[in-house]
Amino acid sequence: MRLLVVVLAAVISGSVAAAPAGYFNLRPGVALESGDSWTDAGARYHLYGVQSCLRGTYYADSSGRREDCGEASLAVMAAFIADTKPVCSPIATIAKVTHVVCYATVGADQLDLGNLMITSGYAFAALQADGLPYSPAYAVAEQVAREKRAGLWQFKDVQHPAILLGRAAARSPTIQ
């Protein structure tokens, strides 16, 4: 009986890979808020330099059906989490949100999760207030996805979330 317990413990612990020091596992089952942010155990996280499509914004799919753009981003993020078991590292905490970079494992390769989201066409390079990307590499990845008409870019009416956020900011009154 004791041997069975030891064998079970070894099998169970062997199937869960621990994240390297300074990193944490992004596990399936976290509460996704969008295709770029989530909560886990009361803490909020955001994929640094990534802007998902906004929930409540829509595009017309190839059959003309109206689909929620943010839900599409969220679904792809959930699939990447489930399929690639990302490992993340915090890089900054701003306004109680921890911004992270994550890598996903695909076969023997470790790939940047933000880059995967953007090159798949289901997320965008996040822009600073001055219009410059937080990550120039992500801006290049976005341009490649757009040119290849990957993911959401295949639909003519998809708008970059930065455009929508900029319009919303311009309409909101300034507090002085």
Predicted features and spans:
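N-terminal signal peptide c-region/cleavage motif recognized by signal peptidases
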Residues: 13-15
